[in-house]
Every structure is written in C-alpha cells, then in structure tokens.
C-alpha cells in the first residue's frame, strides 16, 4: 500500500520564464491525480511548493535557482515606516470572508487589475471558468477576503489558503486606481494580523525573486524567511 505521505512528481517541459528575461523555466508538479488535503498540502508548502488552482508545484530549473520560497514569521515581524503608513491609511476598510465561488463583482475587479498591472501577462483575457480554476483547488480550505470602504465599494480581494502552520497568500487583486492606498502592502499586513489572531506562525508568500520587480517586493517585509538547501532561514540580501 502506498504511504499517505508518498507522492509521485512530474517535471514540466521547459518554457520561457515568466519573471526573468532570457531564462527557461521548468516546474516540478505533484501528481494531480493523488488525493490532496490540508495536511498533505501544508507539508508540501513547508518544502517550498505552492499551488495554482489544483496543481501543486515548485520551480525546478536546471541552471537557475532564483525562485526562493518565502514566508513571514509573524511573531517576529515588525512593520517599517511605509508599511505603518499603509496600515493607517486603510483603517476605513472592512474585511469579510467569502466562500470560493464566482461573483461578477470580483471577476470585474480581477480583469481590471490584470489589464492595468499585468497587461499581456497571459491572464488578462481570462474567462470566468479560467478565474475559478486559478483561484480554487477543490480540496483545500480557501477563502476570498473582500476589502470594502465605508461606501461598500469593493477595493480588493485576497484568496487565502488555510494551512496547518499558517496562511498561504494564493493571489490578491485590487482597484488599480487606488494607488495611494498601497493595497498590495495592506493585504499582506492584514494577512499577518489574521495569522497572529489565529495563533498561526507563518504567512507564506510564494516565491521571492531578487531580480524580478514583480516578486522582489516581498523582501520589504522583515524578517523574511526563504527555503534554501532544504531548510528555512532568514533572508540576508546582498
């Protein structure tokens, strides 16, 4: 009998890297047919994996190790000046948990966000089915967190996975016209606060990539731990 903790893995064909120019990327995927649950997934996340929809993967590139799994140890986190400012500026926002299901209001915000922040990124022409397949897994405890202002206007949505040792920031999208609010920063700060309230030690942020503007911002959250050489350690940027 196959052990509950055993997985089969598959390597993807090489493809152009989405984050670094002139680089080729390959991913290691957990068997999509294997039964997955919060305990198994949490174990894989601690080993540097992440999910997109129901597919659980981690980068496994032959000549590059730029993608570093990253997490915030919430008990040690101390916001910097700009993060404190973003938190204070957004105190008029309310957060509400919603189940993962299609809402036209969410999808419209998702499309506007991608069209402005990531045009020609491969997702800005997503259909409702594409959107749900990207956000939902079908096997994990995922919530959509709505952030609304005092006029009940939807400004941001964060998809968050529950793990046995933390929260995993799956994806977030927000009003591209609300630049002064620094909503991307605020959402991560909210997730840190929520993990603390739930007595969970970590917020997992996916991958930190030093030379990618899309991914390097994560090192602004101190301390940041990265998974290297089969262990988590505090990132020391050089």
Curated annotation (Swiss-Prot):
Transmembrane segments: none annotated. It catalyses: N-terminal L-glutamyl-[protein] + L-leucyl-tRNA(Leu) = N-terminal L-leucyl-L-glutamyl-[protein] + tRNA(Leu) + H(+); N-terminal L-aspartyl-[protein] + L-leucyl-tRNA(Leu) = N-terminal L-leucyl-L-aspartyl-[protein] + tRNA(Leu) + H(+). GO terms for molecular function: arginyl-tRNA--protein transferase activity; leucyl-tRNA--protein transferase activity. One of its GO terms (cellular component) is cytoplasm. One of its GO terms (biological process) is ubiquitin-dependent protein catabolic process via the N-end rule pathway. Its EC number is 2.3.2.29. It is found in: Cytoplasm. Functions in the N-end rule pathway of protein degradation where it conjugates Leu from its aminoacyl-tRNA to the N-termini of proteins containing an N-terminal aspartate or glutamate. HAMAP family: Bpt. Belongs to the R-transferase family. Bpt subfamily. PANTHER family: ARGININE-TRNA-PROTEIN TRANSFERASE 1 (PTHR21367), ARGINYL-TRNA--PROTEIN TRANSFERASE 1 (PTHR21367:SF1). This is Aspartate/glutamate leucyltransferase.
């Amino acid at each position: 009998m196959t052990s509950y903790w055993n997985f089969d893995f598959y390597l993807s064909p090489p493809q152009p890297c989405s984050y670094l120019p002139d680089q080729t990327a390959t991913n290691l995927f957990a068997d999509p047919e294997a039964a997955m649950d919060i305990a198994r997934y949490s174990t894989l996340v601690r080993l540097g994996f992440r999910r997109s929809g129901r597919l659980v993967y981690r980068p496994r590139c032959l000549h590059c190790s730029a993608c570093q799994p990253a997490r915030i140890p919430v008990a040690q986190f101390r916001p910097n000046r700009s993060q404190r400012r973003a938190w204070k500026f957004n105190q008029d926002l309310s957060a509400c948990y919603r189940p993962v299901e299609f809402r036209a209001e969410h999808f419209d915000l998702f499309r506007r966000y991608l069209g402005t922040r990531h045009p020609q990124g491969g997702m800005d022409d997503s259909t409702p089915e594409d959107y749900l397949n990207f956000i939902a897994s079908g096997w994990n405890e995922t919530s959509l967190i709505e952030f609304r202002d005092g006029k009940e206007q939807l400004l941001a949505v964060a998809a968050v996975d529950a793990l046995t040792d933390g929260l995993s920031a799956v994806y977030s999208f927000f009003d591209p016209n609300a630049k002064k609010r620094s909503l991307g920063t605020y959402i991560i700060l909210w997730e840190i606060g929520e993990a603390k309230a739930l007595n969970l030690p970590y917020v997992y942020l996916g991958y930190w990539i030093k030379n990618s503007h899309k991914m390097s911002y994560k090192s602004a959250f101190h301390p940041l731990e990265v998974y290297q050489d089969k262990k988590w350690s505090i990132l020391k940027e050089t």
